[in-house]
A protein has these predicted regions:
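Conserved GNAT acetyl-CoA-binding A-motif
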Residues: 109-120
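C-terminal "cap" of GNAT-fold acetyltransferases
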Residues: 122-129, 145-166
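Conserved active-site alpha-helix within GNAT-family acetyltransferase domains
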Residues: 94, 98, 110, 123-141
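A short beta-loop-alpha structural element at the N-terminal edge
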Residues: 4-19
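Acetyl-CoA-dependent GNAT
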Residues: 8-11, 24-90, 101-102, 107, ...
Length: 166
Protein backbone atom coordinates (compact mmCIF):
# COMPACT_ATOMS: atom_id res chain seq x y z
CA UNK A 1 0.00 0.00 0.00
CA UNK A 2 1.44 3.36 -0.98
CA UNK A 3 1.30 6.43 1.24
CA UNK A 4 1.64 4.49 4.49
CA UNK A 5 3.31 6.62 7.14
CA UNK A 6 4.86 4.97 10.18
CA UNK A 7 5.42 7.17 13.22
CA UNK A 8 5.56 7.00 17.00
CA UNK A 9 2.21 6.37 18.63
CA UNK A 10 0.77 9.19 20.74
CA UNK A 11 -2.11 9.58 23.16
CA UNK A 12 -4.09 11.02 20.24
CA UNK A 13 -4.08 7.48 18.77
CA UNK A 14 -5.84 5.86 21.75
CA UNK A 15 -9.32 5.80 20.20
CA UNK A 16 -8.10 4.44 16.85
CA UNK A 17 -5.95 1.74 18.48
CA UNK A 18 -8.84 0.71 20.74
CA UNK A 19 -11.17 0.49 17.74
CA UNK A 20 -8.62 -1.57 15.80
CA UNK A 21 -8.33 -4.05 18.69
CA UNK A 22 -12.11 -4.32 19.05
CA UNK A 23 -12.10 -6.53 15.94
CA UNK A 24 -11.63 -10.26 16.56
CA UNK A 25 -8.95 -10.57 13.87
CA UNK A 26 -6.82 -7.94 15.62
CA UNK A 27 -6.59 -9.63 19.00
CA UNK A 28 -7.13 -13.30 18.12
CA UNK A 29 -3.44 -13.83 17.36
CA UNK A 30 -2.22 -11.86 20.36
CA UNK A 31 -2.23 -12.46 24.11
CA UNK A 32 -4.59 -9.50 24.55
CA UNK A 33 -8.04 -10.06 25.98
CA UNK A 34 -10.95 -9.05 23.75
CA UNK A 35 -12.77 -5.74 24.08
CA UNK A 36 -9.99 -3.53 25.43
CA UNK A 37 -10.98 -0.18 26.86
CA UNK A 38 -9.61 3.19 25.88
CA UNK A 39 -8.26 3.49 29.44
CA UNK A 40 -6.19 0.35 28.85
CA UNK A 41 -4.58 1.82 25.75
CA UNK A 42 -4.25 5.25 27.32
CA UNK A 43 -2.27 3.70 30.17
CA UNK A 44 -0.04 1.80 27.74
CA UNK A 45 0.64 4.80 25.53
CA UNK A 46 1.09 7.16 28.45
CA UNK A 47 3.41 4.94 30.47
CA UNK A 48 6.62 6.49 29.05
CA UNK A 49 8.46 3.21 29.67
CA UNK A 50 11.95 3.65 28.16
CA UNK A 51 12.03 -0.08 27.36
CA UNK A 52 8.84 0.03 25.26
CA UNK A 53 8.49 1.86 21.94
CA UNK A 54 5.18 2.03 20.10
CA UNK A 55 4.66 2.91 16.45
CA UNK A 56 1.53 3.25 14.34
CA UNK A 57 1.07 2.81 10.61
CA UNK A 58 -1.30 5.38 9.15
CA UNK A 59 -2.93 5.61 5.75
CA UNK A 60 -4.62 8.91 4.92
CA UNK A 61 -4.29 9.86 8.61
CA UNK A 62 -6.14 6.70 9.72
CA UNK A 63 -4.36 4.27 12.07
CA UNK A 64 -4.20 0.89 10.29
CA UNK A 65 -1.43 -0.84 12.23
CA UNK A 66 0.44 -0.93 15.53
CA UNK A 67 3.98 -2.08 16.36
CA UNK A 68 5.20 -2.39 19.95
CA UNK A 69 8.91 -3.10 20.60
CA UNK A 70 9.90 -4.35 24.08
CA UNK A 71 13.35 -4.61 25.63
CA UNK A 72 13.92 -6.65 28.78
CA UNK A 73 14.65 -4.88 32.06
CA UNK A 74 17.45 -7.31 32.87
CA UNK A 75 20.78 -5.66 32.04
CA UNK A 76 22.28 -8.90 30.70
CA UNK A 77 19.43 -9.21 28.17
CA UNK A 78 19.59 -5.68 26.78
CA UNK A 79 20.85 -7.12 23.49
CA UNK A 80 17.38 -8.68 23.02
CA UNK A 81 14.06 -7.25 21.89
CA UNK A 82 10.62 -8.69 21.33
CA UNK A 83 7.69 -7.15 19.54
CA UNK A 84 4.02 -7.34 18.67
CA UNK A 85 2.27 -6.26 15.49
CA UNK A 86 -1.41 -5.66 14.81
CA UNK A 87 -2.88 -4.68 11.43
CA UNK A 88 -6.53 -3.69 10.95
CA UNK A 89 -8.50 -6.48 9.31
CA UNK A 90 -9.40 -4.35 6.27
CA UNK A 91 -5.70 -3.76 5.60
CA UNK A 92 -4.29 -7.24 6.24
CA UNK A 93 -2.46 -8.78 3.31
CA UNK A 94 -1.60 -5.40 1.80
CA UNK A 95 2.02 -5.09 2.93
CA UNK A 96 1.47 -3.03 6.08
CA UNK A 97 2.78 -5.82 8.31
CA UNK A 98 5.92 -5.94 6.15
CA UNK A 99 6.38 -2.18 6.44
CA UNK A 100 6.04 -2.38 10.22
CA UNK A 101 8.50 -5.29 10.30
CA UNK A 102 11.02 -3.29 8.27
CA UNK A 103 10.76 -0.39 10.73
CA UNK A 104 11.14 -2.78 13.67
CA UNK A 105 14.24 -4.47 12.22
CA UNK A 106 15.84 -1.13 11.34
CA UNK A 107 15.04 0.30 14.78
CA UNK A 108 16.47 -2.74 16.58
CA UNK A 109 19.55 -3.15 14.36
CA UNK A 110 20.56 0.47 13.88
CA UNK A 111 19.30 2.34 16.93
CA UNK A 112 18.93 -0.05 19.86
CA UNK A 113 21.99 -2.21 19.13
CA UNK A 114 19.80 -5.31 19.45
CA UNK A 115 21.53 -8.57 18.53
CA UNK A 116 18.57 -10.96 19.01
CA UNK A 117 14.93 -10.26 18.19
CA UNK A 118 12.58 -12.92 19.54
CA UNK A 119 8.88 -13.66 19.38
CA UNK A 120 6.20 -16.21 20.06
CA UNK A 121 3.56 -16.79 17.39
CA UNK A 122 0.53 -19.06 17.57
CA UNK A 123 1.23 -22.23 15.58
CA UNK A 124 -1.97 -21.77 13.54
CA UNK A 125 -1.03 -18.22 12.47
CA UNK A 126 0.29 -19.11 9.02
CA UNK A 127 0.41 -15.54 7.74
CA UNK A 128 2.40 -14.44 10.78
CA UNK A 129 4.85 -17.33 10.41
CA UNK A 130 5.36 -16.45 6.76
CA UNK A 131 5.92 -12.78 7.52
CA UNK A 132 8.49 -13.50 10.21
CA UNK A 133 10.34 -16.02 8.04
CA UNK A 134 10.45 -13.41 5.25
CA UNK A 135 12.44 -11.20 7.63
CA UNK A 136 14.93 -13.91 8.57
CA UNK A 137 13.32 -15.31 11.71
CA UNK A 138 14.02 -18.99 12.41
CA UNK A 139 11.90 -21.40 14.44
CA UNK A 140 13.49 -22.46 17.73
CA UNK A 141 10.82 -24.60 19.32
CA UNK A 142 7.19 -25.19 20.22
CA UNK A 143 5.49 -24.04 23.42
CA UNK A 144 2.73 -26.59 23.95
CA UNK A 145 -0.58 -25.32 25.36
CA UNK A 146 1.01 -21.87 25.50
CA UNK A 147 -2.18 -19.80 25.72
CA UNK A 148 -5.91 -20.14 26.20
CA UNK A 149 -7.93 -18.81 23.26
CA UNK A 150 -11.49 -19.39 22.13
CA UNK A 151 -12.07 -21.98 24.84
CA UNK A 152 -9.01 -24.12 24.17
CA UNK A 153 -5.28 -24.26 24.71
CA UNK A 154 -3.15 -23.47 21.68
CA UNK A 155 0.52 -23.99 20.88
CA UNK A 156 2.98 -21.25 20.00
CA UNK A 157 6.21 -21.33 18.07
CA UNK A 158 9.29 -19.53 19.39
CA UNK A 159 11.23 -17.73 16.67
CA UNK A 160 14.26 -15.46 16.64
CA UNK A 161 16.42 -13.42 14.32
CA UNK A 162 20.09 -13.01 15.16
CA UNK A 163 21.69 -9.92 13.65
CA UNK A 164 24.27 -10.88 11.04
CA UNK A 165 27.84 -9.78 11.63
CA UNK A 166 28.10 -8.00 8.26
Amino acid sequence: VNNVIIRRATLDDVHAITQMHADYSAYANTLQLPYPTEKTWEARLGANDPLVTQFVATLDNVVVGLLVVHQPAQIRRRHVASFGITVSQAFQGKGIGSELMQVMVDYCDNWLNVHRIELEVFAANGSGLGLYEKFGFKQEGILRDYAFRDGQYVDAIVMSRIKSKS
